[in-house]
Each structure stands twice: as C-alpha cells, then as structure tokens.
C-alpha cells in the first residue's frame, strides 16, 4: 500500500527564493591548483588510451579538488539540493577532451548512468536541428526551445557550460519539497494522483517488448524521506496519446497545479551559466526549467550554446519506491535508438 506523507517536509531542502538568492551559499570555486589536478588526471586518461567510465575515483585521485566536489555532494544531499562548481577547466579543449574532464569530476560525484537508448553517459545539450518537443522522438536536450519544469531520472543532474548563447537559456530551480508543502495547504485532494503517477513517453527509446510509454510517480515517501520525480510535461502529454487514450482532466489539473506553484516568482531562483560553470541539482528534492535560447547570428557550430550533461547516482544514496525510479539507474538499450 502506498504511504502518503500528510505533514509538511522540514529541513534545508525546503526553501524559497529569498533563502537561496545569495549564491555564495551554494557556489564552490576551483582554484588554479585544483584545476591543474583535474587537467592532469584527464590528460593521463587520454595518454593511456583509457575510457574514464572504466575507472573509479580511487584510480583517478583528486587530492584537493576531490574535497571540494565532496562539499558539493554534501550540499546536494543534505542542503538546498543545488550547487555550482565554478572554474571547471574547459578553455581551449575540444568537446571530447571536455567530456573527459567532466568525467573526472563525475567520478568524484558518484556513478554516471546511461541517459539514452544508446547508453551515452555524457550527452551534448545543444540545438541538434532535428525538430522540437512536439516531435514524437525529440528529447529536451536536443532542442533550443524552452523546457518546462522537470527533474531528471538519477540523483544528480550535472550541466557543464562550454559555450553560452547570446540570448536566453536561463536556468531556474525550485524546491520540490516546498512545492509539496504548498500542495498540502492548497490542494491536498490531489496528493493521491502524484503518488499514483502518470504515463510518460519513451520518445522512441523504449526497450524491446515494452510499450511506448511508462508510468512514473511524481512523489514517493519511503524510510522517512519524501522524494520527487517530475518529468517533462510534453512527455506526459504525448505518452497517453501513444497509448491510445486521453489524459484525464484531473491529471492535467494536478500537473498544472504543480507547475503553477513552481512558477511563482518567490518560489524559484534563476541563474545563467557561463563557460566553466557546472550546475548541479539534486533531482530528489528540486525541479528545474530552462528558457529558450538563440545562437550566434552566423549559425557557426563553434559559437553555438553547448553544454554537457551527466546523470549521477551518489554513493549510498537514498532509497525510494520503485514507482518513482524508472530510469534512476540509467536508461535501458532501446529496441531502435533514435538519437
């Protein structure tokens, strides 16, 4: 039987904008020595022809930088659920070299998991020019349009900025725990729907023999902890359509209500990433959205907005119901990968 939390969540993961607006509380800056550690580790991996994902943090020690990354994890898991690691060395590196740098940092965050049906553990967030979210196969990281409130599948989503667009692309984060407390006050009759979950579209990346959409809960309560997973609304809209039925109006109301609370100006903090910034969010306790962005007028690839993303599970992370964790441990190989 599903256990529904009927009292407010407490702790640092419950916040509004005024409490986190001072970014120095959750910003961690790599100094030159730390940057050198990371670069040297990445260079060793490249020189030896190794794949960073075949290694673990013991094989890639970061004496000083590793301690700062550990502080980020502490902030994510036991603090506000967001952190900024500033000064990640990417200047002058190729995209492939930057992926290794991100992988080195990722090893000290936790375990990277697959983000698509190809099994990619690092994906490029940029405009692929393949279409928009109303397409049946496009994922959010492949388009430059705005992305509504959502969380990703693992414990931590890490975004490393390589180049930024001239216009737009702002990043907004809200506390899912504060949203829950507001729902308790304003719409308690909807709570059961969030625990039951809705259907989300695989976007053509369903494993062999599985339907094109899957049910995932939005909130789950387990071992005294509330956790959240709120995937893209576009995927909920197209998921039910692919299964051959229309989404019930009460489910639409529940999703509308969740997003309206997150969108209140006092309930979220906004930021813009610059090259070398790694934004970290804890998907268990936060949701985020992205503004639309436009690239350089000349359209050259080198000047286009380009971020790298990792999905990370932390060591000894929290446990929660399987209804909430469809892709927590990574996406399975797709029958027909589309990306």
From Swiss-Prot:
Its EC number is 1.14.11.-. Its cofactor is Fe(2+). It comes from the Bacteria. It catalyses: 3-(N-acetyl-N-hydroxy)aminopropylphosphonate + 2-oxoglutarate + O2 = (R)-(3-(acetylhydroxyamino)-2-hydroxypropyl)phosphonate + succinate + CO2. InterPro entries: AlphaKG_dependent_hydroxylases, TauD-like_sf, TauD/TfdA-like. Fe(2+) binds at residues 150, 152, 288. The keyword ATP-binding does not apply. It holds the Pfam family TauD. SUPFAM superfamilies: Clavaminate synthase-like. Pathway: Antibiotic biosynthesis. It is an enzyme of class 1 (oxidoreductase). Binds 1 Fe(2+) ion per subunit. Keywords: Antibiotic biosynthesis, Iron, Metal-binding, Monooxygenase, Oxidoreductase. GO terms for biological process: antibiotic biosynthetic process. Transmembrane segments: none annotated. GO terms for molecular function: metal ion binding; monooxygenase activity. Monooxygenase involved in the biosynthesis of the phosphonate antibiotic FR-33289, an antimalarial agent. Catalyzes the oxidative decarboxylation of the antibiotic FR-900098 (3-(N-acetyl-N-hydroxy)aminopropylphosphonate) to form FR-33289 ((R)-(3-(acetylhydroxyamino)-2-hydroxypropyl)phosphonate). Has a jellyroll core motif at the center and helical bundle motifs at the periphery and an unusual lid structure which consists of two beta-strands with a long loop between them. An access tunnel is found at the back of the active site which connects the putative binding site of 2-oxoglutarate to the solvent outside. Homodimer. This is FR-33289 synthase. It comes from Streptomyces rubellomurinus (strain ATCC 31215).
